């Protein structure tokens, strides 16, 4: 029987394969490129390409693709065969260094946000050697960046790599001040916890909203939801367990460190969490994970829903972005050590994170802004739209002591005794967890909990890296060259705490009183919707920071603003059109059919027994008739609004109409349709109900 270690990474051209397949000088040169960013010589690229091709062909590959992440939010690929004609009329397998390093896909059909006209079709893909190539099916996939003919980034990987480069530069400056001359590189490491729903494929195919939108737009509340908390960490059902086993195997073959799996809070909701990896690799792996989750689900006659809010009335899905900074010498810069009060380097990086989040709240919020995530944030199941940091009692007390120049006595670790002799004693952590916080310190990392389940983690990590890099730059500028480093460091930490402690909140983020305190007393931002959040990227401070660090150009910032707003508008427009279609073609005919049979029942009963009241049937007929009229009116009103929306030329104006008008009309249509569902006999309802969907996988 094969063990996981026998096949883990078997479809990845990783360091083990490179060491075995490449000449020693070529391997050493490529490692310098990967580890230090050194340029790659042509002869090295040719040698790597040959070895990569031979290895891929051995594993059954016939094609290669430059695998990239355009601004659509999903991955893209164009497959080219290895074959080339030979003089004898046959074919040989070829793959050159040039084909490895650079590709030229048509860029005209990808979102550009005005960076290029449709007729300007040329785009380039460039190999990212820090992310290993892998085989998917019969295709060698080469992770790449994607840019326009004139050099603007048209993808999510390029600015992520730029942000990592900026963060590395500034973090090294700070570490040198503490005498860390041996550190050559600082990298952000990420572990995204992926939540998802699994539903029966046959039921999925009967619902237009799921097929077109990935989430339900109608659905009356079933008798049972998540009230009993019996699904969270519950026994995994056989069909789901078989899916998870298959999924793990596929992910492990691709070198993805899938580690933890469990049932989540809502019925049919689950989670998959990997071990941490460097941010750009974690981003690639998460994109692959989402793709494979959906493919594997289909093999099991299931559908994997990645939408943030696929069902009303139960928890939605997020993607907790666990983030820390690590040196190439193996040090986690967010690890407090045994005595955080005395760990000056840790305290400086901690304060940098606090200042970064406070100064750039809006960038963090907009990094997770989508139409789907708007339904989740602030809904007492996910963090509120107000950004705050949870540090826990011990670290907060440490910072308070520094701010007030008072002694800190420390928090002793206590042993928990459960009162049963056979059970082990264990040490209690000095910090609890706060599941309501958007940005929580959890012992040696920060957990950014606002990312949507279907979203790429690239944008969130770009903004985290950028804000941190800018803050570390400010700290380095102040500390470099000072005559008394310890005194200057103490003053900087103290001033940072005093200036930015408003962002620290260890309480209940779901409490309405907190939102009031945050906005009215602390002056924190409450950007509740995507249009509100996206607009802040154009603020002068944000543009200057992102451009000065060379993460984005001004044109790239503007383009992303346009693309994200367009995506918001198109997403909601599709949902609105789907609601109108379902209401008119499915829900109203079902209600009318039931009304017809009810009327026939009344006629038959009164004919058989003249004078019968038939109160139940007549009351139901009256209610359903009224609801049918209201459904028709609400569908027409929404349809008219969507038609008018098409005539609005400016995407910003359209987004605000959607926020203020369209979403309200969609909600009004849903209310009456859901009410009709609740009093219509099951056999008449035209598609599976919430009860069917949420409890249909056994």
Question: Predicted segment positions?
Answer:
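Short linear, low-complexity motifs centered on an aromatic residue
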Residues: 73-89, 105-108, 207, 214-216, ...
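C-terminal amphipathic alpha-helical interaction region
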Residues: 493, 498-698
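Active-site proximal loops enriched in glycine and acidic residues that flank catalytic Cys/His/Asp
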Residues: 44, 68, 96, 274-276, ...
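Catalytic pocket of metal/acid-base enzymes, prominently hydrolases
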Residues: 1-27, 41, 122-142, 442, ...
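Gly-rich Lys/Arg/Thr-decorated short loops/hinges at beta-loop-alpha junctions or inter-strand turns
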Residues: 1-14, 33-35, 223-232
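Active-site-proximal loop/turn and secondary-structure-junction residues that shape catalytic pockets
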Residues: 44-48, 68-70, 98-99, 146, ...
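Active-site core of metal-dependent hydrolases
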Residues: 8-120
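Glycine-rich, acidic/polar active-site loops that bind/position phosphate-bearing ligands
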Residues: 121-306, 315-318, 325-562
């Amino acid at each position: 029987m094969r063990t996981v270690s026998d096949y883990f990474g078997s479809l990845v051209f990783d360091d083990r394969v490179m060491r075995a397949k490449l000449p020693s000088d070529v391997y050493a040169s490529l490692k310098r490129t990967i580890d230090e960013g050194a340029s790659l010589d042509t002869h090295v690229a040719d040698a790597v390409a040959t070895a990569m091709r031979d290895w891929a062909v051995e594993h059954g590959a016939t094609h290669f693709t430059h695998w990239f992440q355009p601004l659509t939010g999903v991955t893209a690929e164009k497959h080219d065969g290895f074959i080339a004609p030979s003089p004898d009329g046959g074919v040989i397998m070829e793959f050159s260094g040039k084909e490895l390093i650079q590709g030229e896909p048509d860029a005209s059909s990808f979102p550009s946000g005005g960076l290029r006209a449709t007729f300007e079709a040329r785009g380039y893909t460039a190999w990212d050697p820090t992310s290993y190539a892998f085989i998917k099916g019969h295709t060698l996939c080469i992770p790449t960046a994607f840019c326009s003919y004139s050099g603007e980034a048209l993808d999510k990987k390029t600015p992520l790599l730029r942000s990592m480069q900026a963060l590395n530069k500034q973090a090294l400056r700070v570490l040198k001040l503490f005498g860390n001359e041996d550190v050559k590189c600082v990298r952000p490491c990420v572990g995204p916890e992926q939540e998802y729903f699994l539903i029966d494929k046959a039921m999925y195919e009967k619902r237009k909203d799921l097929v077109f939108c990935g989430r339900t737009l109608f659905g009356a509340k079933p008798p049972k939801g998540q009230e009993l908390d019996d699904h969270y960490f519950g026994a995994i059902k056989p069909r789901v367990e078989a899916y998870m086993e298959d999924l793990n195997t596929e992910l492990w073959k691709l070198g993805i460190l899938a580690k933890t799996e469990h049932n989540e809070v809502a019925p049919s909701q689950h989670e998959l969490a990997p071990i941490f990896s460097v941010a750009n690799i974690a981003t690639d792996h998460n994109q692959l994970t989402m793709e494979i989750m959906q493919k594997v689900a289909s093999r099991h006659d299931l559908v994997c829903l990645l939408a943030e809010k696929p069902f009303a009335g139960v928890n939605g899905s997020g993607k907790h972005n666990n983030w820390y900074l690590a040196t190439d010498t193996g040090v986690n810069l967010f690890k407090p050590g045994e005595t955080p009060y005395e760990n000056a380097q840790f305290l400086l990086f901690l304060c940098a994170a606090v200042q970064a989040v406070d100064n750039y709240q809006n960038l963090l919020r907009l990094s997770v802004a989508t139409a789907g995530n708007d339904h989740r944030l602030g809904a007492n199941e996910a963090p509120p739209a107000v950004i705050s940091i949870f540090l826990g009692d011990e670290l907060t007390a440490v910072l308070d002591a520094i701010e007030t120049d008072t002694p800190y006595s420390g928090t002793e670790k206590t042993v928990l005794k459960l009162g049963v002799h056979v059970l082990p004693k264990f040490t209690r952590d000095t910090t609890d967890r706060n599941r309501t916080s958007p940005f929580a310190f959890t012992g040696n990392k920060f957990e950014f909990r606002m990312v949507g389940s279907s979203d790429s983690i690239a944008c969130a990590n770009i903004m985290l890296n950028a804000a941190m890099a800018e803050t570390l730059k400010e700290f380095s500028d102040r500390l470099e060259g000072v005559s008394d480093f310890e005194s200057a460091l103490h003053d900087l930490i103290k001033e940072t705490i005093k200036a930015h402690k408003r962002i620290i909140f260890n309480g209940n983020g779901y409490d309405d009183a907190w939102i009031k305190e945050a906005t009215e007393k602390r002056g924190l931002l409450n950007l509740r919707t995507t249009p509100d959040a996206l607009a802040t990227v154009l603020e002068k401070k944000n543009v200057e920071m992102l451009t000065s660090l060379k993460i984005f150009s001004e044109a790239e910032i503007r383009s992303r603003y346009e693309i994200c707003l367009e995506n918001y508008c198109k997403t909601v427009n599709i949902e609105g059109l789907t609601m109108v279609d379902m209401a008119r073609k499915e829900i109203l005919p079902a209600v009318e059919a039931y009304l017809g049979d009810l009327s026939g029942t009344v006629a038959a009963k009164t004919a058989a027994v003249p004078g019968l009241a038939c109160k139940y049937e007549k009351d139901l007929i009256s209610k359903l008739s009224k609801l049918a009229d209201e459904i028709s009116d609400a569908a027409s009103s929404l349809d008219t609004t969507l038609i008018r929306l098409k005539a609005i030329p400016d995407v910003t104006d359209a987004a605000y109409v959607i926020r203020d008008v369209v979403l309200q009309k969609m909600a009004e249509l849903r209310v009456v349709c859901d009410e009709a569902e609740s009093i219509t006999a099951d056999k008449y309802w035209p598609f599976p109900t919430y009860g069917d969907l949420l409890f249909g996988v056994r």
